Amino acid sequence: MLESNYTMPTEFLFVGFTDYLPLRVTLFLVFLLVYTLTMVGNILLIILVNINSSLQIPMYYFLSNLSFLDISCSTAITPKMLANFLASRKSISPYGCALQMFFFASFADAECLILAAMAYDRYAAICNPLLYTTLMSRRVCVCFIVLAYFSGSTTSLVHVCLTFRLSFCGSNIVNHFFCDIPPLLALSCTDTQINQLLLFALCSFIQTSTFVVIFISYFCILITVLSIKSSGGRSKTFSTCASHLIAVTLFYGALLFMYLQPTTSYSLDTDKVVAVFYTVVFPMFNPIIYSFRNKDVKNALKKLLERIGYSNEWYLNRLRIVNI
């Protein structure tokens, strides 16, 4: 450990979930399956949106960006976590820790803004259909995306810089499975009040404001839906809105629970369980909740599979001709 006014360990050690090897192997297999499904589902959605002309609209443009963020957010955490399940020494360098913290926080904050943009897009389409092309023009969509990535990167960089200016002259054992801000603040032997206040302020602003936008948008949508005379149209829209609201509530609930509580009441074991859901599990379910229940996406997927099947059939026929 470096001895100076600014003290930083040469490495951080993760406690992880358990030291019992059979359970670690089981968790490795479970999370490997979850990560694989996350990658396949989100990559497939991105491909569908980009190759299908019927999906070239703002809603699916935001969905493809959400899928990219889910892939990125999960990739920032899961590969290292999987490696640590099978490693005897679950360590990470300070630079690796800083990078992991930066990328995860960037993608998580950007995802909050993308979810808000998606809710606003649905509000514009259902509540103001005549103004939809103006409210959700290509320029507006690009501005939403740029704002999401820029604000996510900026706030994340601030957190990382302030966190790694602290001294860690005590233990270097992180009771977590990745480098997150609260457990590192708990390890510091210097005053972390500024860090805690800034974490609370930025998280309150980004997470609370975007959640309010989402809630108001869906509330207006539901009010509009109540005026629909067709019971079938009402039930379909209610079903879609309900699934989206449940997913958003769970995602934001986990984030608010993690980052808007004081360090003094920080429960390491409880927060690890909560963190698993928003870092590993939610990215797997987002494509199902937001996309694959959608008729347009199902049709696009069906056409893609038919195209692949036709290509394979054509290739096999060519092989038969050559063999003859």
Swiss-Prot record:
It is found in: Cell membrane. Residues 1-25, 76-99, 155-196, 259-271 are extracellular. InterPro entries: GPCR_Rhodpsn, GPCR_Rhodpsn_7TM, Olfact_rcpt. Disulfide bonds join C97-C189. It holds the Pfam family 7tm_4. One of its GO terms (molecular function) is G protein-coupled receptor activity. Keywords: Cell membrane, Disulfide bond, G-protein coupled receptor, Glycoprotein, Membrane, Olfaction, Receptor, Sensory transduction, Transducer, Transmembrane, Transmembrane helix. Glycans are attached at N5. The chain crosses the membrane at residues 26-46, 55-75, 100-120, 134-154, 197-217, 238-258, 272-292. GO terms for cellular component: plasma membrane. Residues 47-54, 121-133, 218-237, 293-324 are cytoplasmic. It is a multi-pass membrane protein. Belongs to the G-protein coupled receptor 1 family. Odorant receptor. This is Olfactory receptor 5AS1.
